[in-house]
From Swiss-Prot:
There is a cross-link at residues 405, 647, 673, 698 (Glycyl lysine isopeptide (Lys-Gly) (interchain with G-Cter in SUMO2)). It holds the Pfam family MBT. Residues 1-70, 604-649, 672-703 are annotated as: Disordered. Residues 35-49 have a biased composition (Low complexity). This is Lethal(3)malignant brain tumor-like protein 2. Putative Polycomb group (PcG) protein. PcG proteins maintain the transcriptionally repressive state of genes, probably via a modification of chromatin, rendering it heritably changed in its expressibility. Its association with a chromatin-remodeling complex suggests that it may contribute to prevent expression of genes that trigger the cell into mitosis. Binds to monomethylated and dimethylated 'Lys-20' on histone H4. Binds histone H3 peptides that are monomethylated or dimethylated on 'Lys-4', 'Lys-9' or 'Lys-27'. It comes from Rattus norvegicus (Rat). Its main location: nucleus. The modification Phosphoserine is found at residues 13, 67, 338, 681, 685, 687. One of its GO terms (cellular component) is nucleus. There is a cross-link at residue 698 (Glycyl lysine isopeptide (Lys-Gly) (interchain with G-Cter in SUMO1)). A zinc finger (FCS-type) spans 81-116. InterPro entries: Mbt, MBT_L3MBTL2_rpt1, MBT_L3MBTL2_rpt2, PcG_chromatin_remod_factors, Znf_FCS, Znf_FCS_sf.
Length: 703
């Protein structure tokens, strides 16, 4: 029966909701984007809100807010340090701040951009509702639905291109200039530190699921079909985020093995092709090796392991960082470590922050991790009694894009919490002696003195015999820091202790030194000496920040392990550039982290990584961390800024594997009859058993 005009059925939300439920069922009911851009008071949704052009320009690559509902609940349980402001959640982007710093009288939005974007979405939603005959609403509705794979792909592959203002390549540009970890590890038989050793990186607590022998579905680069096809591969070796894969069918032939980063969207659990109607095609090199690929795969897959179905979803969730461009905070002054300065977040890449000093030039920056002990919320210095540089005249930075986006101070609970201290029964006192890592020469552990005791467990420490007499070289450590040690720590652990300047007696003797200086050593019970089972071993490879030039991340080796203390050696550099770091330092990363986040990795400066460079640069006088720094790459001023555009994903993968663009050939794809087989399931398994995606297997044969 024909319906009267004007009474046609309008699209309702019910089919869309059913479709969403179906999507979630495929992945265990988990959708990492359900709360991505939702407001605190709106319903949870897996849709993406349509943003205006102004908002898209404001977004920086790698800056993704955390779930606002989670932050809002956390805010209610924590008091803001030193301020009586209540927490507020932006209804557009979900960022958390203080109400007094938010935009407009209603304090609903963090910036003008968010307010306009929200208004634009509301208007579009109202127009759409009128066209569909629905009652108007004031809420900003979702206008488009994006597939979960598209969202993940956009996030993992679009980390930004080009260079930062300081000349650091990012995103695809960084990958083009990337270091070949696979060849480096294979040629020298090196071992990489496991991802589980690094508690500040994505999926560190789930990387035990990645094991030798597990099966995955990967892009088939050895096929001449016009569309993207996949094939099953086996993990031969795991090295950080990178794995050595071998296509099924090559068996013991390692000539076609290839390295791949598991964080990319071209690696999937078994069954992904069947679910997403993708074709499994054997590589051309071995397509004639078997006549019945289906039976072969069934034998190879039964009882094997694969990645969890929500592996990439959790990867994306773990790569969302609460810091955003425009947030204000306090950071150590790199020109005088005894004080802090006000700074603004300019860039966020993989949790690492590029900070711009408010009273400096547009290129006066400082790099650190968001968990670094060198950054603090606004007001921290005044509260604990630490020195801060108060600028009488603020530089005119109105032309700088970052300073035009300042909208709120970073709230205290975004920073890593320090351990609570209890001063009853004795505490650190001024004049006490101890041993500490020199922040201006990170390869040395020196004799040091407590110069001032601050509030909340913070201590101002100076190296004995230092050049400064005005306290400008004092530095702040928390009492729970793993960079300070009781007297005789170096002696007990066979570490060379740097004595005070002018001290002639060798070896250094603490007892005679304390008697000579009429001082006492800090009690050993006051130091935090717990040692976790971190998993680091001598010789392991990793990626480490050069703290003398903290925007650089370099190929490095664990040279020595002393309890939880690691001596990091930069491959290709002299031993004088070695650095002591804690096993939980946020400045060390697993192999493949730079590739995963789109950060440029600095390769060794010589072909032999363990041979110190004998050239001019390796033997020059050592520089201070916050002073004039040595350069590993050309400076931003002398290097041209490279403009580049994003490449198609297929082209990127083919270039990475050294394969030219496939040319369509006369190939017949033969469908294989679908069969089902029940698989045994063990009692406990670190990763799921494989389904048999035989319905998606196709075979190539010559015409």
């Amino acid at each position: 029966m024909e319906k009267p005009r004007g009474t046609e059925e309008t699209p309702s939300s019910e089919p869309m909701e059913e479709e969403e439920d179906d999507d979630l069922e495929l992945f265990g009911g988990y959708d990492s984007f359900r709360s991505y851009n939702s407001s605190a008071g709106s319903e949870s949704s897996s849709y993406l809100e349509e943003s205006s052009e102004a908002e898209n320009e404001d977004r920086e690559a790698g800056e993704l807010p955390t779930s606002p509902l989670h932050l809002f609940s956390s805010a209610n349980n924590r008091a803001l340090d030193g301020s009586g402001s209540e927490p507020a959640v932006c209804e557009m982007c979900g960022i958390v701040g203080t109400r007094e710093a938010f935009f407009s009288k209603t304090k609903r939005f963090c910036s003008v951009s968010c307010s306009r974007s929200y208004s634009s979405n509301s208007k579009k939603a109202s127009i759409l509702a009128r066209l569909q005959g629905k009652p108007p609403t004031k809420k900003a509705k979702v206008l488009h639905k994006a597939a979960w794979s598209a969202k993940i792909g956009a996030f993992l592959h679009a980390q930004g291109t080009g260079q930062l203002a300081d000349g650091t390549p990012t995103g695809q540009d960084a990958l083009v200039l990337g270091f070949d970890w696979g060849k480096f590890l294979k040629d020298h038989s090196y071992k990489a530190a496991p991802v589980g050793c690094f508690k500040h990186v994505p999926l560190y607590d789930q990387w035990e699921d990645v094991m030798k022998g597990m099966k995955v579905e990967v892009l088939n680069s050895d096929a001449v079909l016009p569309s993207r096809v996949y094939w099953i591969a086996t993990v031969i070796q795991a090295a950080g985020y990178r794995v050595l894969l071998r296509y099924e069918g090559f068996e013991n032939d390692a000539s076609h093995d290839f390295w791949c980063n598991l964080g990319t969207v071209d690696v999937h659990p078994i069954g992904w092709c069947a679910i997403n109607s993708k074709i499994l095609v054997p590589p051309r090199t071995i397509h004639a090796k078997f006549t019945d690929w289906k039976s072969y795969l069934m034998k190879r897959l039964v009882g094997s392991r694969t990645l969890p179905a929500d592996f990439h979803i959790k990867m994306v969730e773990s790569m969302k960082y609460p810091f955003r461009q425009g947030m204000r905070l306090e950071v150590v002054d790199k020109t005088q470590v005894s004080r802090t300065r006000m700074a603004v977040v300019d860039t966020v890449i993989g949790g690492r922050l590029r900070l711009l000093y408010e009273d400096g030039d547009s290129d006066d920056d400082f790099w650190c991790h968001m968990w670094s002990p060198l950054i603090h919320p606004v007001g921290w210095s005044r509260r604990v009694g630490h020195g801060i540089k108060m600028s009488e005249r603020r530089c005119d930075m109105s032309h700088h894009p970052t300073f035009r986006k300042i909208y709120c101070d970073a709230v205290p609970y975004l920073f890593k919490k320090v351990r609570a201290v209890y001063t009853e029964g004795g505490w650190f006192e001024e004049g006490m002696k101890l041993e500490a890592i020199d922040p201006l020469n990170l390869g040395n552990i020196c004799v040091a003195t407590i110069c001032k005791v601050l509030l909340d467990g913070y201590l101002m420490i100076c190296v004995d015999g230092g050049p400064s007499t005005d306290g400008s070289d004092w530095f702040c450590y928390h009492a729970s820091s793993h960079a300070i040690f009781p007297a005789t720590f170096c002696q007990k652990n066979d570490i060379e202790l740097t004595p005070p300047k002018g001290y002639e007696t060798q070896p250094f003797d603490w007892e005679s030194y304390l008697e000579k200086t009429k001082s006492k050593a800090a009690p050993a019970r006051l130091f935090n000496m717990d040692c976790p089972n971190h998993g680091f071993k001598v010789g392991m490879k990793l990626e480490a920040v050069d703290l003398m030039e903290p925007r650089l991340i370099c190929v490095a080796t664990v040279k020595r392990v002393v309890h939880r203390l690691l001596s990091i050696h930069f491959d290709g550099w002299d031993n004088e550039y070695d650095q002591w770091v804690d096993c939980e330092s946020p400045d060390i990363y697993p192999v493949g982290w730079c590739e995963l986040t789109g950060y440029q990795l600095q390769p060794p400066v010589s072909a032999e990584p363990n041979t110190p460079q004998k050239g001019k640069d390796a033997t020059k006088k050592k520089k201070k961390q916050f002073g004039k720094k040595r350069k590993r790459i050309p400076s931003a001023k002398t290097r041209p800024l490279r403009q580049s555009s994003k490449k198609p994903l297929l082209e990127d993968n083919l270039e990475a594997l050294g394969v030219s663009e496939p040319v369509p050939d006369d190939i017949i794809a033969v469908c294989v009859k679908e069969e089902h087989q029940d698989l045994p399931s063990p009692d406990r398994s670190p990763s799921p058993l494989l389904p048999l995606p035989t319905e998606s297997i196709k075979q190539e044969r010559d015409s």
